Amino acid sequence: MRNAHAPVDVAMIGFGAIGAAVYRAVEHDAALRVAHVIVPEHQCDAVRGALGERVDVVSSVDALAYRPQFALECAGHGALVDHVVPLLRAGTDCAVASIGALSDLALLDALSEAADEGGATLTLLSGAIGGVDALAAAKQGGLDEVQYIGRKPPLGWLGTPAEALCDLRAMTAEQTIFEGSARDAARLYPKNANVAATVALAGVGLDATKVRLIADPAVTRNVHRVVARGAFGEMSIEMSGKPLPDNPKTSALTAFSAIRALRNRASHCVI
């Protein structure tokens, strides 16, 4: 059992926009101690320079000086295989932000098996969407339908299959660029899949969750809408998210959900 007065020993996986924002938020929190950061080898020197000697910066789980109590992943899909699986297997509880990767059943199974083997818990962060707790609760009574609608400015879809469907730089009216299952959305739009996958895993699953993605020149932010109905009644939630100040491509709420996960881990009263 953890000493009630000792800070939770944390390893952070990734130190990009989200990781840096999380670190700044908890750096002086007496209940938490970010003692380790895992990043790719080519980033180690830069991160060491930013954090100094108080944090052990390494490129692999094997290089950790000891096993941390808790790990937070905010590094991208590849980190789940390389770092989260071995940490779970070693008995470290982990919270992950890269939910879109879990549309890969083999990866989801590998994470679940590693957690079972290590007696650890894998927590999926709610990220950029709210209402996940209500959706997961509603699932207990039975859900009839869940739909996720994601709406972004046209230029937010650059580098995706949407470029073959319309001229994203010259749009004057909204256009649906994808309609199908959450699993197919994750496959075709992997960099935009985290919210759809989170909604799906909390509700009726990746194949039954309906997804609609829209390029809309009338919006200036990413807009997420979830509609569900079931034995509980009906729900509809819409969020228009702001990005992190230093990274316009990253949802601020995603970073806040990671901060909340760390503080919940250290708290004796959690909501």
Swiss-Prot record:
NAD(+) binds at A128, N194. It comes from the Bacteria. The iminoaspartate product is unstable in aqueous solution and can decompose to oxaloacetate and ammonia. GO terms for molecular function: aspartate dehydrogenase activity; NAD binding; NADP binding; oxidoreductase activity, acting on the CH-NH2 group of donors, NAD or NADP as acceptor. Its EC number is 1.4.1.21. Belongs to the L-aspartate dehydrogenase family. Pathway: Cofactor biosynthesis; NAD(+) biosynthesis; iminoaspartate from L-aspartate (dehydrogenase route): step 1/1. This is L-aspartate dehydrogenase.
